[in-house]
Amino acid sequence: MVTYTHFGKQPDVLKHLVLCEVLQIEKPQIYVETNSACAIYTMTHTPEQKYGIYHFLNEANEDATFQNSLYYQLENESMASGNYLGSPALAMKVLNNDVKGCLFFDLEKRALDNIESFARHQAVAPPIRTFNCDSTDGVLKLLPSLPKSTFLHIDPYEIDKPNSNGHTYLDVLIGATKFGMKCLLWYGFMTINDKQALNKSVSERLDKAGIKDYACSELIMNAIKKDTIVCNPGILGSGILATNLSQKSNSMIQDYSKKLVRIYKDARYKEFDGSLYYDTINKKQNIKIKRHL
């Protein structure tokens, strides 16, 4: 039994919706994923999944943009069989043979076995390699040997927590960005205090590294509080940080994020308000600071 249980929750909707479209637009030659988890999962109809992928699929029926999205098409087909496609499967299906290779990192061997099994059962799949190790150091070590046409999907929970060698996933983003590679980094937080501390840390690190051209999108539950956790649908707020992407991709990220806010306007998670609001850490964008007591 693989221990990863966050599949199909609301943050996955934002992350995977954007990932599929970005990969289709950018068409990388090499795909690298830092925290892969599994390629495919059996759905269990938890309240968190109902608030996540089930709500999205139901509401997307009324939105032509989402109906035409790769994420909707791939998940709608898979969910008919009771399965959710994780990011490794989505990446393989979107990229197909148009990519030279996909590199998947995870600390859990069972997750990597799941990815390899999924790839073997596909009629068309790109060449893949799996790495059962700490992906922070593993990817940092690989970066100099990877082409500029590489795309990194950096998907931890804590992006600024150092590993045993003092390296963080933010270091991975900065290193890859400086090599000219395209990056999509996901992060999460549970309180407004956590968000503000993370935003400050990320902004300062990027500024220090000389990285000023980046896109950011955050979706946050209106139920979030300043310093207390009132509920746990998987995560109360999450963000996507993108570097070296085309303007088309950057615009899509903002557009899709705001459309998600609209389809979640009447959502509920258990007895809590499940509606979302949009924010960003990028001071060049229109920042909305919201008060939560």
Predicted regions span which residues?
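Class I S-adenosyl-L-methionine-dependent methyltransferase catalytic core
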Residues: 1-293
